[in-house]
Amino acid sequence: MKTHRIARWAQLTAASCAAALISGCATMEEASTSFSCMLSRVTSSPDPRCGGPVTTGGARTPAGSAAGSQNERFARLQAALDQETAHAAELQKQAVQAMQKLPVRQRSVAGPLRTRPVPITDGQSGVTSQLQAFSSLSVDMPLAAKGRGEYTRAMDSLKDLANELADNRGSSTILVEQADADVSAGRVNTSSGTTQTKNGKPVNVRKKVDSGLPVGIERYTIEAGEIRGKL
């Protein structure tokens, strides 16, 4: 399963490298982080390894050509964002499949995957376009399965997603909603905190009591950091 996740992410990275907004795939190191570099240009925590935004060098560009380049940049960024959403959906699917052979009450259940419109401004033309980006997804995890290998594998998929989103976006959040009765009975860990990815990006872990959540269930919602800025 782990090998499958790595292979899948390698395919997505290669695809995003081919459609990069700028020449971010010139070296092997840049190729391995091309997706992150693409998104770093429109987040609040750009990666200095990715270089600066593309400039025209002061040359005048015909209006039609400028509009075409602008549209192409938006299209390529949207393609990268779509890949990020597809990869998130794949990891959610893996988290659910990992527990499908357990008894029904011990299986994880996929919740909604949400995207949101994000205004992105083209740094060369000043034109702003609304792009669609991954926002969050959730998976309900039964307490009865804790300690089993299947539960651990499902959690690994969710943690992988949170770490990848943090590296791509600058940060991510794991929101864990817990049933009131489980919190009162001390059946769940209610501690919040922050961890870091291998690249030093923060993954915030928040716990929240939800009176409407069924007893014996923790709802894990993986939220991506904000995208804002210019191409």
Q: Model-found features: residue ranges?
A:
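C-terminal motif of bacterial Sec signal peptides marking the signal peptidase cleavage site
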Residues: 21-24
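Short, aromatic/basic amphipathic alpha-helical patches
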Residues: 184-200
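Q/P-rich, low-complexity intrinsically disordered regulatory regions
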Residues: 155, 183-189, 205
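Bacterial N-terminal signal peptides that target proteins for export
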Residues: 2-13, 17
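Short, low-complexity, glycine-enriched hydrophobic/amphipathic alpha-helices that associate
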Residues: 26-84
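Periplasmic peptidoglycan-binding/tethering modules of Gram-negative envelope proteins
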Residues: 70-152, 157-170, 200-231
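Structural motif
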Residues: 177-180
